[in-house]
Amino acid sequence: MDLYPESILNLIKSLSTLPGIGRRTAERLALHILHAPLHEAQTLANDILELKQKVTLCRTCFSLSDQPECRICSNPRRDASIICVVEKPTDIVAIEKSGAFSGLYHVLGGALSPMDGIGPDELRIRELFSRACSKTTTEVIIATGTNVEGEATAAYISDQLRKKGVNVTRIASGVPMGGDFQYVDQVTMQRAMEGRRGF
């Protein structure tokens, strides 16, 4: 039997629908919000509403943006001749944190997965081909995941773009920094050996 008032139960139920939030965590969050100053709760509510109302997809790269073009696509300092293809907007965040890339991005919106009914038409591959075949593009870097779906997506895009004469590369993968060889799987080790470079 729940002893909380209905409004608290409703918030617990809503919070527990979020990824990684179970009932106990949702309960703690709901009680925290209840005891927080009213302006903090109002700010949180307003931020959620603003997120839902303003955030959309960039018209160029399909990343998240609150403007027609995202900050990266609208930045004249970015190298517009290189496009890095990723599966989702969070992949951009990871790459940007590295500081190793200064080009533009293209978010596919997922990866090919025939078992789940996701083919090329369900992703933003057509839009990628249009961008990649422009005269200003010198390289397309494929940075999809290294799982089966990511590899299949990379192979499909690479094959199609090479037929169109586009220079295509794939991000390297291999042994992580500080990784112990005894814990590295065979595929990762194989890729690390194949992707070796001068030192």
Swiss-Prot record:
One Pfam short name: Toprim_4
GO molecular function terms noted in the UniProt entry: DNA binding; zinc ion binding
Keyword hit for Secreted: no
GO biological process: DNA recombination; DNA repair
Function summary: May play a role in DNA repair. It seems to be involved in an RecBC-independent recombinational process of DNA repair. It may act with RecF and RecO.
Family matches, as HAMAP family: RecR
PANTHER family: RECOMBINATION PROTEIN RECR
Name of the protein in question: Recombination protein RecR
Organism field: Desulforapulum autotrophicum (strain ATCC 43914 / DSM 3382 / VKM B-1955 / HRM2) (Desulfobacterium autotrophicum)
Originating gene: recR
